[in-house]
Each structure stands twice: as structure tokens, then as C-alpha cells.
């Protein structure tokens, strides 16, 4: 697939990516067998390719010239996943230690935004503590996405790297704006949007009607081994 990338003069895939990923560059390195170089290019713009390589809506592929011309885009998302998995397998992904600047930041929320903010702040020398209100780190990555799309072991693997780099995670932390933890120089609020939007439609009040996120969160807990009483099961 990487060989199909044409390194377009006007790279629509690059423009379409909210992260500013550079598919032509990392796919060229991948095609040439330069996996470490591909990994370095990819992670230059993307903190967590193992997540996006599995669950991203792949706007890059929708903008690929081969998609527009013959409805057969380069499988950029799968190539991302292949690169990062090769990087873990070959040992390219190693915890790094950064020079500290003496400042500390509390990141509230451990979903995609919180993890990315923590990762970037840590790289810039801040002492980072991530607070998560639920019992596991990951936010909607963990509770809103089924295992067949994103195995929770993938999340745990990345969190382990971040912990080894000096980031602290605290779960079951019930925090609001009137109860921020003390002792930090700054706060980064990354609470996401977990509140579902209700619909005022006929039948909404019927038994057995639930928000999708409620069902997904409960099922992910069941798969993690938690016991849910029969009367509470969705």
C-alpha cells in the first residue's frame, strides 16, 4: 500500500489531517524499509499513532487523490498502525527523560485530549499529574470504544510508557472547577464531552432505551471483569 502513494505535489491527505500528519513522507520511508525513520516522521506530528491507526475516521484517505480518482485510496490509517506496531516490536519506542523546568501542571481528564496534553507538557519539562474521575485511565478511549476496535491493552501499553517518562496518573479523582487540586502552577482542563445529547422523540421514555455511551461503558467494564448486578445491566 505504501508503494501506491504518489507523493502528490498538492498533498490533500496532509491538508485533511487535523494533526498535520505527513503521509507521503512516512509512507515513502515505510516502502523503502526504513521503519525507524517512518516512525520518527509519524510521531513528529502524532503522539499516539496506535490509537489513530485503529479508530481515526481517516480524513486523509477520504482526501487521497486515488480515492477521488478511482475510489481506492491508499490505506494510510492501516499503514500508521503497521508503523507504530513495528516500532514497539523493534524497540524504537523507549521511555525518555526530559530536562525539568521546575513547574508543575495538573491535567484534568485522561481521554485523548488529556493524554496528548500530558505527553506534550511532559516533553517540555513540566511535572505532570493526570487526574481521572473514573476507575481506569483512558476516558472514552477505554469506556466508549469496544475492544474489537481498540484493545485496552493498547491503552495500557502507552500509559506504561508515559508513567516511565515521569507522568503521574490518579484515578477515582472527583474534581470540579471549585475543587481543583492544590500545589500546581497551572491546570489543563481536558474533560471531553461525556454527556450524551438527549432526544425529545416519541418512545424516548420506554423501558430499554439507553444512550449508546452508557451501553458501551458498561460492556467495557464487564469485559474488564467487573461484576454488574443483573438488574443494572443494559
Language model region names:
Residues 7-32, 53-83, 129, 133-136, ...:
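Iron-sulfur cluster-binding cysteine motifs and their immediate structural context
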Residues 4-7, 44, 48, 62-66, ...:
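General structural signal for alpha-helix termini and helix-helix connectors
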Residues 7-12, 46, 149-152:
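A ubiquitous short alpha-helical element
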Residues 11, 23-24, 49, 57, ...:
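Proline-rich intrinsically disordered, low-complexity coils
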Residues 1-2, 21-54, 70-97, 219-220:
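Ferredoxin-type iron-sulfur electron-transfer modules in oxidoreductases and energy-metabolism complexes
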Residues 1, 80-234:
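Residues forming the flavin
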